[in-house]
């Protein structure tokens, strides 16, 4: 059986891995086997952290909204605000409410006072 030279195909595969791992440190950017393992690990981390980022931002938005609504009244909280918003069928999501809480507190106070009535 004759020997098969896999130069082009193998070199193209290794080049793709090296381009992905170019910014990694040490042997992880130079050695093919280490770079392949680090690439798989990086992709797993990216997939996991996309979900984690969504949870983290949701928690941040809730904290910001709650802080501003508690300034408004002593017996008023985030949960009551969201309940009243849904009751009135106002379609304001947490991202928009958090931006209002940071950029324009008065607007959020007006909204919360109107939906209490």
Swiss-Prot record:
UniProt keyword Zinc present: no
GO molecular function terms listed in the Swiss-Prot or TrEMBL record: rRNA binding; structural constituent of ribosome
Broad class of the protein's primary localization: plastid
Keyword vocabulary terms for this entry: Chloroplast, Plastid, Ribonucleoprotein, Ribosomal protein, RNA-binding, rRNA-binding
Compartments, record wording: Plastid, Chloroplast
Record-linked InterPro entries: Ribosomal_bL20 (IPR005813), RIBOSOMAL_L20_CS (IPR049946), Ribosomal_protein_bL20_C (IPR035566)
A UniProt-annotated Pfam family: Ribosomal_L20
This protein's record includes keyword Plastid: yes
Any single Gene Ontology cellular-component annotation: chloroplast
S-S pairs: none
GO biological process, any: translation
Similarity annotation: Belongs to the bacterial ribosomal protein bL20 family.
NCBIfam families the record matches: rplT_bact (TIGR01032)
Protein purpose: Binds directly to 23S ribosomal RNA and is necessary for the in vitro assembly process of the 50S ribosomal subunit. It is not involved in the protein synthesizing functions of that subunit.
PANTHER family referenced in this protein's UniProt entry, alphabetically: 39S RIBOSOMAL PROTEIN L20 (PTHR10986)
Protein's name according to its UniProt entry: Large ribosomal subunit protein bL20c
């Amino acid at each position: 059986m004759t020997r098969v030279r896999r130069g082009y195909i193998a070199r193209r595969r290794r080049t793709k891995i090296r381009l992905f791992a170019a910014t990694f440190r040490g042997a992880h950017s130079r050695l093919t086997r280490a770079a392949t393992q680090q690439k798989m690990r990086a992709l797993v981390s990216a997939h996991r952290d996309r979900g984690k980022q969504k949870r983290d931002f949701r928690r941040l938005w809730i904290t910001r909204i709650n802080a501003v609504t508690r300034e408004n009244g002593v017996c008023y909280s985030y949960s009551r605000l969201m309940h009243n918003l849904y009751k009135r069928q106002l379609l304001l999501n947490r991202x928009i409410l958090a931006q209002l809480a940071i950029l324009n507190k008065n607007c959020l106070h007006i909204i919360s006072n109107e939906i209490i009535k």
